[in-house]
């Protein structure tokens, strides 16, 4: 059921080619079945992004309680550029007061993608219960010896036994953002979002650590079926409130004492389906009551659980130094960030120039601020955990092209 769109949400579209290079493109936005009269047409700037576009959305209050009314408006987005085939995204979600980020890759092949409903409003099969800790025996099975955040997740877009389903290679943080944007609402309290994100990460890292599907003879990490794993929707938009939490906590997971593997933190909506794990709507109520993410997680998984951090993050050349870089900081970590930003600005020319001298001055702070603004992060001008790894991830991607 739809509702009158009498509030406003925001959309930013980012267009790149297959190598991640920004593209000058035209973005047309349509509502409903009207394919002739766009509600907005925007051009991307020098870094392949549109400005924030205001679009009507249902009242935010609809997303704050269970119901049958869809709490977001849906728009169809068509991106086109000279030398590339057009891409059409159907059903991009807009929530009141929230920035929606739609990333589109243009190639020589046209694409038409449909974004299915959020699991809280859509009709998806419930999770088949599993043991939260997988038995690991000396049977010759593949098992990692440390908890690792992989650079890439292989997502099987169907149930495990469906050999016709496509396997997609998705960067880990992008995968978590997609799942969280498909499983919960971005209007919820930050601590609720954090608790749900950490549960999603922990579940996913359990699949990685135990090589669950590979030990069953499959060649993927996880599926997009809610009966087996989480909901992942190819090409879907994400939301700034969720994206920022993932950037900050993407290496965190749920642990129990004396258990090495991340806990398989199963969850359900708590209204249409129930389970022994986290209730998504229940976590929303706890967040409204001021509970922290850890308190929310302990409410569902027990008082002995704690939030752990993965030992290894794959694909990152230099690990976070353990403290925030700011004006007055100096040394090798500052040099690392300066070198990485210097390479990034060759592609993202809106980032101002900076010296590579190992001293965190005003120019470095200005470059960091512009990077944060460009990638929809809180603009602080300082390099915290989230900014360090965001810069590093983009640096690695662009360095491969250099």
Write out the residue ranges for each language-model feature.
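Beta-strand-rich domain onsets/edges
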Residues: 1-22, 42
């Amino acid at each position: 059921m739809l509702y009158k769109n009498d509030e406003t949400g925001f959309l930013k579209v980012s267009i790149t080619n297959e190598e991640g290079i920004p593209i000058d493109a035209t973005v047309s936005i349509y509502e409903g079945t009207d394919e002739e009269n766009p509600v907005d047409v925007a051009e991307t700037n020098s870094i392949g992004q549109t400005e924030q576009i205001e679009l009507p959305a249902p009242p935010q209050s609809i997303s704050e309680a269970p119901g049958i009314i869809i709490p977001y408006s849906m728009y169809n987005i068509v991106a086109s550029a000279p030398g590339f085939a057009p891409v059409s995204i159907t059903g991009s979600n807009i929530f009141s007061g929230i920035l929606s980020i739609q990333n589109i890759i243009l190639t020589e092949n046209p694409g038409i993608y449909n974004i299915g409903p959020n699991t809280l409003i859509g009709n998806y099969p419930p999770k088949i219960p599993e043991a939260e800790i997988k038995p690991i025996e000396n049977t010759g099975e593949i098992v990692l010896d440390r908890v690792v955040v992989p650079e890439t997740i292989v997502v099987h877009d169907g149930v495990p036994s469906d050999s016709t389903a496509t396997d997609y290679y998705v960067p880990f943080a992008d995968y978590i953002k997609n799942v969280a944007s498909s499983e919960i609402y971005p209007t919820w309290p930050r601590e609720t979002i954090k608790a749900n994100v950490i549960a999603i990460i922990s579940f996913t890292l359990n699949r990685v650590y135990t090589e669950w599907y590979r030990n069953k003879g499959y060649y993927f990490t996880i599926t997009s079926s809610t009966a087996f794993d989480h909901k992942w929707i190819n090409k879907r938009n994400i939301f700034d409130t969720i994206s920022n939490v993932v950037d900050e906590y993407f290496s965190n997971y749920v642990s129990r004492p004396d258990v090495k593997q991340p806990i398989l933190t199963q969850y359900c909506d708590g209204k249409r389906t129930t389970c022994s794990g986290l209730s998504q709507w229940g976590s929303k109520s706890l967040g409204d009551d001021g509970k922290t993410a850890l308190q929310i997680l302990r409410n569902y998984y027990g008082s002995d659980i704690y939030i752990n951090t993965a030992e290894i993050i794959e694909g990152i050349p230099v690990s976070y130094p353990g403290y925030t870089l700011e004006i007055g900081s100096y040394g090798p970590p500052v040099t690392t960030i300066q070198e990485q930003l210097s390479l990034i600005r060759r592609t993202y020319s809106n980032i101002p120039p900076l010296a590579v001298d190992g001293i965190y001055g005003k120019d470095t702070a200005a470059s960091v601020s512009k990077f944060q603004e460009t990638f929809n992060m809180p603009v602080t001008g300082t390099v915290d955990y989230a900014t360090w790894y965001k810069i590093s991830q983009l640096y690695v991607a662009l360095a491969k092209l250099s």
